[in-house]
A protein has these predicted regions:
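Extended, helix-rich architectural segments
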Residues: 1-131
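Extended, regular secondary-structure scaffolds
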Residues: 116-213
Length: 213
C-alpha cells in the first residue's frame, strides 16, 4: 500500500465525522496543512522522503534517529505508578504492560506529532491501544483537556478494507463516557466505502464490539 493512500484518510474521514458530530463539524478545523505535514513526517520517519529519489535513495535516516532520541530523553527519568488500594495494585499490574513498550510507542508519537493511549479489555486483561496523531481527530476541549475525539483504524481481510470510526465523548456535567462506533467496507484503502451493520462484519477483531456504549 502506498504511503499516500495509507494516510489520506483525513480527507474522506471529515465527511463521516461531520455526520457524527454536526455541531462540531471538522470544517472548523484546519486539517489540510496538518494532513500534509503528517504525511511528510511519516515518510521521513520511514526513511522514504519524497526527495530521496534526487539523492539516489541514499539518506541518513535522521527522522527515526531524532524521534528515537526524543523518546529516550523523555524516558530517562520517567516514573509513573498507580497506588493506594487493591484496585490500584491491579491497575498497576496492567499498566506495567504499557510501560514495557512505552519508549517504542513514544518514538512513533514523536515522529508524527502526538500519541494517545486508549485502554480496552480482552480476555479479562486491560491492553493499551497506542494511537498516533494521524489516527485520531480531537473534536472538543474543556480547560485544555480533550473531551471528545474520533478514532480511526483499518483492517484488511481478503480483498476488502474494513474501517472502524469510533467517537468517544466525555461529559463533565453528566459524568458520562459514551462510545459510538460506525463500520465501513471498501475495496480500496483510500476510500471509506459503504457503512455496514456490525452483524455483517467479516472481521474477528470487531465482531463483538457494541456500537453504542
Amino acid at each position: 500500500m502506498k504511503r499516500r493512500a495509507k494516510y489520506v484518510f483525513l480527507s474522506w474521514l471529515r465527511s463521516i465525522v461531520n455526520k457524527l458530530d454536526p455541531e462540531n463539524a471538522t470544517s472548523n478545523y484546519q486539517f489540510d496543512n496538518m494532513e500534509e505535514a503528517m504525511e511528510v513526517w511519516l515518510e521521513i520517519y520511514a526513511d522514504e522522503p519524497s526527495w530521496s529519489k534526487d539523492c539516489h535513495n541514499k539518506t541518513l535516516n535522521l527522522g527515526a534517529t531524532i524521534a528515537s532520541e526524543f523518546a529516550r530523553l523523555i524516558m530517562i527519568e520517567f516514573e509513573s505508578k498507580i497506588t493506594g488500594s487493591e484496585r490500584a495494585d491491579y491497575l498497576q499490574e496492567q499498566y506495567e504492560r504499557l510501560l514495557e513498550q512505552l519508549r517504542v510507542r513514544l518514538e512513533a508519537g514523536c515522529a508524527v506529532g502526538g500519541i494517545m493511549f486508549k485502554p480496552y479489555v480482552r480476555n479479562g486483561v486491560i491492553l493499551p491501544d497506542c494511537i498516533t496523531q494521524d489516527k485520531f481527530i480531537p473534536l472538543n476541549y474543556s480547560n485544555g483537556i480533550i473531551t471528545a475525539a474520533v478514532f480511526f483504524n483499518q483492517e484488511v481481510k481478503g480483498k476488502n478494507y474494513y474501517t472502524r470510526v469510533e467517537k468517544q465523548t466525555y461529559s463533565y456535567e453528566n459524568k458520562s463516557h459514551t462510545i459510538e462506533s460506525h463500520f465501513f467496507v471498501s475495496s480500496s484503502p483510500d476510500n471509506i466505502g459503504a457503512e455496514i451493520n456490525p452483524e455483517n462484519l467479516d472481521s474477528d477483531m470487531w465482531s463483538r464490539i457494541d456500537p453504542y456504549i
